[in-house]
Amino acid sequence: IFPRPVLQPPKMRPLTEEETKTFFEKLSKYIGKNITYLVERSDEPHVFRLHHDRVYYVSERVLKKAECVPRDNLSALGVCFGKFTKSGKFRLHITSLDYLSQYCRFKVWIKPTAEMSFMYGNHVLKAHVAKISEEAPEHEGVVVFSQTSDLPIGFAVTAKSAAASAKLDPTAIVAFHQADVGEYLRNE
């Protein structure tokens, strides 16, 4: 009988070059060159760290304080931006919405009657759109805002460019749902 290998729990570590490339490609679909504002902050330096296939955005000060926590006891640290799937793709989580909305390039505002539909996981239809960023291209990330409160409620990927979506019929999909604030309740 062979002894069983003792598996060490994964510790929080910097992203590899390939992981960084995949992560930044996905993030740039939503915030473009504004990634530099996340990486090169003037107020307090922040870093991206990988832990249990999830990417966290954490300040270096908090990271140094967390070094004394045993890795068995560390479940999360900072803001979770998303996770890597088993196939190696990166999927953004709703927890990154505050940063995406702050630095996003393209926005979609939806009508109050469509907010619940979007928050139940449905795509954004032409009839739901109150306003869209004029220069939004096809298959690009957008942050979805409420028209009444101007608060971010999720993010999506455009199905057509803003110019092309103006000519669509009311039942056509303008943006494909990716994540919304209703996930907090649905996933619990």
Question: Regions from the language model: what does each represent?
Answer:
Residues 2-188:
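Accessory RNA 3′-end/elbow-binding domains used by RNA modification enzymes
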